[in-house]
A protein has these predicted regions:
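Phosphate/pyrophosphate-binding catalytic cores of soluble transferases and nucleic-acid-acting enzymes
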Residues: 2-8, 12-13, 20-333
Length: 333
């Protein structure tokens, strides 16, 4: 899907004078802003039912799915990411699945460019793009004006070494002094984000928050959030993890080892994969690995909810409601 999306995007498509946001949106969509084709987003926590809703919406709207799950971007990481099989996609075109090797470090800036190319391609063919996933930063990077500062390998390597030697708490305190607002938004345990924030501050001389998304939309969009009662979601997570192991997660991980999974800074830390590696290495029993995956996923769900609930443009629907599809369709019309 990625190759098709990129090959069909015409050179210069989507470029327009930068001094007029309305003109830019109208130009990219080739129609006046008020009636511009919209991107439909389906977001929410893990296991809430986003994928099922997106397939149903795609059938009703003539839509195509653009993946916004950061782990489903990785080739061969299928079972542990709950990636839909070809049959489960029911003929709905999906973009940005299986595009990165497991050794590739997650790069929001690269994802942004690829996702916008895919969305522009879908719009150019008169279809509806459905941006679907639980990676909040990836979604915002696509939907909003968000320019990424450059990187410096030497600065990044030095900060990552400091992270190893000093721990995330010390670097988080340094971030708090340099950019209190960013420190409030980044968990003290999130070493990768802390390192990136400090790198941006050092390279630009500006607060990291200056690089965060602005509320100015890049695309007109309808944002649908899918969630469930916590007890219901907890049960679904536990069942999903159990089914992951039954479906052959360990075999999937073993097959990825020769491809460099252990060296993948992002992929090797993915929920389920990190624990499966520990089981393979004898550091955890299977029961311990599964229990740790459940706990980690529930913690991740809390972070997802915290991120998405701050966005007032998302309309929330109950994933367990029998009228979920009808309610979602009503929002798109």
């Amino acid at each position: 899907m990625l190759s098709r999306a990129l090959s069909q995007v015409q050179p210069g498509y989507g470029e327009a004078p930068a001094d007029d946001r309305v003109q830019t949106l109208a130009y990219r969509c080739s129609v006046p802003f008020a009636g511009a084709p919209r991107v439909i987003t389906v977001v929410g926590p893990t296991a809430a039912g986003k994928s099922a809703l997106s397939i149903a919406l795609a059938h009703e709207t003539g839509g195509e799915v653009v993946n916004a799950d950061s782990m489903q971007l990785y080739r061969g990481m299928d079972i542990g990411t709950a990636k839909l099989t070809s049959d489960e996609r029911e003929g709905v075109p999906h973009h940005l699945l299986d595009i990165w090797d497991v050794t590739f470090p997650a790069a929001v800036a690269e994802y942004q460019a690829l996702a916008r190319a895919a969305i522009d391609d879908v719009l150019a063919r008169g279809k509806t793009p459905l941006l679907v996933g639980g990676s909040g930063l990836y979604v915002r990077a696509v939907l909003e004006e968000f320019e990424f500062p450059g990187t410096d390998p030497a600065v990044r390597a030095r900060l990552e070494q400091e992270l190893v030697s000093s721990g995330p708490a010390e670097l988080h305190e340094r971030l708090r002094v340099s950019d209190p607002v960013a420190a409030e938004k980044i968990l003290p345990s999130n070493g990768r984000r802390i390192v990136r924030a400090l790198e941006v501050i050092e390279l630009t001389g500006q607060p990291f928050t200056a690089a965060l998304p602005s509320p100015t939309p890049y695309y007109p969009s309808v944002q649908i959030g899918v969630d469930r009662a916590t007890d219901d979601l907890d049960e679904r997570i536990a069942l999903r993890v159990d089914l992951m192991w039954q479906a052959g997660l360990l075999e999937e991980v073993r097959a990825l080892l020769p491809l460099g999974l252990r060296d993948g800074r992002t992929a090797s830390r993915a929920l389920g994969y990190q624990q499966a590696l520990a089981e393979i290495d004898g550091d955890m029993t299977q029961d311990e690995a599964k229990a740790d995956t459940v706990r980690g996923t529930r913690r991740f769900v809390r972070r997802q909810r915290s991120w998405f609930r701050r966005d007032p443009s998302i309309t929330w629907l109950d994933g367990a409601s029998p009228t979920l599809l009808a309610d979602a369709l009503a929002l798109t019309r």
